[in-house]
């Protein structure tokens, strides 16, 4: 009986959040360990279906870097990175589009549909969803110690998002699953960082939440303790004093950009935790790090 009461209390704790987020859009960047662990893939798909059934509108944007790397390796092609961006020639772009828009995207769609969801797979080329431009990058030349433009090939940045196809799918009960591939004005194809795509889509949709699934608990302080909430005003100081470093910097910048475009809150959470998205959305404590404007 105590176990049954505990389960009932969990449902009651979720009720105000279900009411608050009814018909709201939640953009989830799906990547990392949650995409490769069989049990976590299964649970993520079930969680997404649950979100839709109880009245939320989940939009999934997925990565797939390791899967691209595996295919390139099998072809005998070495992967090169500059500041975390894969150098993408035409052959690599063809592989990325095949892996992201084909294998990875359709596997996620199939997993969701297996649990009675109605997922539809898209890339940024579909419905002119993602208009992209070539990413301009600079790096410090080690000889001259001056910044220089670095050509990383067909790596893109988001120029604009066309939300029509997403809202049409949402309004008809479908769950969009989006591969981070964009199209340029001249029809060229670009590989885009999935965090950036998720943030820009969340902003364009004025989503209630942007959730980035990662392979860490969230943002940590210098003692390794999780920081549960970060006001955007604190981020520059946390970067300057070395608290936030490495790959967490672009993730936080992505969150801030999404907030600037109208997203209510952004969250960096541990995708290795079972039901991480549900715990973040429907519990008082949440999980991971919430990023927002919490001070006036």
Curated annotation (Swiss-Prot):
Pathway: Amino-acid biosynthesis; L-arginine biosynthesis; N(2)-acetyl-L-ornithine from L-glutamate: step 2/4
Site (Transition state stabilizer): 29, 251
Keyword entries, A-Z: Amino-acid biosynthesis, Arginine biosynthesis, ATP-binding, Cytoplasm, Kinase, Nucleotide-binding, Transferase
Alphabetized GO MF terms: acetylglutamate kinase activity; ATP binding
The organism's place on the tree of life at top rank: Bacteria
InterPro entries documented for this protein: AceGlu_kinase-like_sf (IPR036393), AcgluKinase_fam (IPR004662), ArgB (IPR037528), Asp/Glu/Uridylate_kinase (IPR001048), Glu/AcGlu_kinase (IPR001057), NAGK-C (IPR041727)
Catalyzed reactions per annotation: N-acetyl-L-glutamate + ATP = N-acetyl-L-glutamyl 5-phosphate + ADP
GO cellular component, one term: cytoplasm
Keyword Cytoplasm attached: yes
A Pfam family annotated for this UniProt entry: AA_kinase
SUPFAM superfamilies tied to this protein: Carbamate kinase-like (SSF53633)
Binding residues for substrate: 64-65, 86, 191
Stretches of the chain forming a coiled coil according to its record: none
GO BP of this protein: arginine biosynthetic process via ornithine; L-arginine biosynthetic process
EC number, as in UniProt: 2.7.2.8
Subcellular location: Cytoplasm
Keyword Cytoplasm: yes
Cited function: Catalyzes the ATP-dependent phosphorylation of N-acetyl-L-glutamate.
Recorded family membership: Belongs to the acetylglutamate kinase family. ArgB subfamily.
Protein name: Acetylglutamate kinase
Gene that produces this protein: argB
């Amino acid at each position: 009986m105590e176990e049954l009461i505990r389960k009932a209390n969990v449902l009651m704790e979720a009720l105000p959040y279900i009411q608050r987020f009814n018909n709201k859009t939640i953009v989830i960047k799906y990547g990392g360990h949650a995409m490769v662990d069989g049990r976590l893939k299964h649970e993520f798909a079930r969680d997404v279906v649950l979100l839709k059934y109880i009245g939320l509108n989940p939009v999934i944007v997925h990565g797939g870097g390791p899967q691209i790397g595996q295919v390139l390796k099998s072809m005998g092609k070495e992967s090169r990175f500059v500041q975390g961006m894969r150098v993408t020639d035409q052959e690599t772009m063809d592989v990325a589009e095949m892996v992201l828009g084909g294998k990875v995207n359709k596997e996620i769609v199939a997993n969701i549909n297996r649990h009675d969801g109605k997922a539809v797979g898209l890339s940024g080329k579909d419905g002119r969803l993602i208009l992209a431009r070539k990413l301009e990058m600079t790096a410090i030349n080690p000889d001259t110690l001056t910044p220089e433009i670095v050509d990383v090939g067909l790596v893109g940045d988001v120029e604009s998002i066309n939300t029509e196809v997403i809202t049409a799918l949402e309004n008809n009960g479908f769950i969009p699953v989006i591969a981070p591939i964009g199209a340029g004005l001249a029809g060229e194809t670009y590989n885009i960082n999935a965090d950036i795509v998720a943030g820009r889509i969340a902003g364009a949709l004025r989503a209630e939440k942007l959730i980035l699934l990662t392979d860490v608990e969230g943002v940590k302080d210098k003692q390794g303790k999780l920081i549960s909430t970060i006001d955007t005003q604190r981020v520059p100081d946390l970067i300057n004093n070395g608290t936030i470093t490495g790959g967490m910097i672009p993730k936080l910048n992505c969150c801030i950009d999404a907030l600037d475009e109208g997203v209510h809150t952004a969250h960096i959470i541990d995708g290795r935790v079972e039901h991480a998205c549900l715990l973040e959305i429907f519990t008082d404590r949440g999980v991971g790090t919430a990023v927002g404007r919490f001070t006036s």
